[in-house]
A protein has these predicted regions:
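Class I S-adenosyl-L-methionine-dependent methyltransferase catalytic core
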Residues: 1-194
Length: 194
């Protein structure tokens, strides 16, 4: 891509890191992990004037290595690519490790809603829910999903496409579940109009 196309792609890529920067305080420490070279370049470009630390390595290993931080309470936001079926198992294992090492952390996991990955998603959520209830450091947890299409309508000859997104939250702060459910209901109403 040429320079103008790269600038446009950088603007589109901002995503989670941009949101984290918007809602962070000056005293907060932000760490971003990216392994893929093109995404790493976009991340560095978007964050060049920010006080952030960018790690170029496997996110699951980095997540475990960076915890626990010096602060007592914090947020881990994990939004894997889920390109490989084993990403579901890797993220599950990593989040359980983080929870054991840093039991005061709020852990938020994004996951895609895809027909072709329905079993992997179900297994991931069941394992995390069981861990939160029965693990060495039990905590509250919940999931919230935003369905934007009928799953059956996403089927194509090349497979199925994204029909929504979900978030699984471990150790949520007070009222987060209610707030997220209200926001998802509001977004769904808007999408029905469009």
């Amino acid at each position: 891509p040429n320079g103008q196309q790269m600038d446009f792609m950088d603007d589109l890529f901002a995503g989670s890191p941009e949101l984290e920067c918007l809602y962070s305080r000056d005293k907060d420490s932000l760490h971003f992990v990216e392994k893929h070279p093109q995404a790493l370049e976009s991340l560095r470009s978007n964050m060049k004037d920010r006080k952030v630390i960018i790690h170029n390595e496997d996110s699951y290993k980095a997540l475990c290595a960076l915890t626990p931080p010096l602060i007592k309470r914090g947020l881990v936001l994990c939004d894997p690519s889920y390109e490989d079926a084993d990403d579901y198992k890797k993220v599950c294992d990593a989040l359980k490790t983080v929870r054991k090492k840093w039991n005061t952390a709020i852990i938020a996991l994004w996951y895609p809603l895809l027909l072709r990955r329905k079993n992997e998603t179900s297994q991931l959520l069941t394992e995390l829910e069981d861990f939160c209830k029965l693990g060495t450091t039990p905590c509250e947890s919940f999931k919230v999903e935003l369905v934007t299409k009928n799953p059956e309508e996403t089927k194509t000859e090349s497979g199925s496409h994204l029909y929504g997104s979900g978030m699984f939250i471990m150790n949520p702060p007070w009222k987060l579940k209610e707030d997220m459910e209200k926001n998802c209901a509001f977004i769904n109403k808007i999408l029905e109009i469009l």
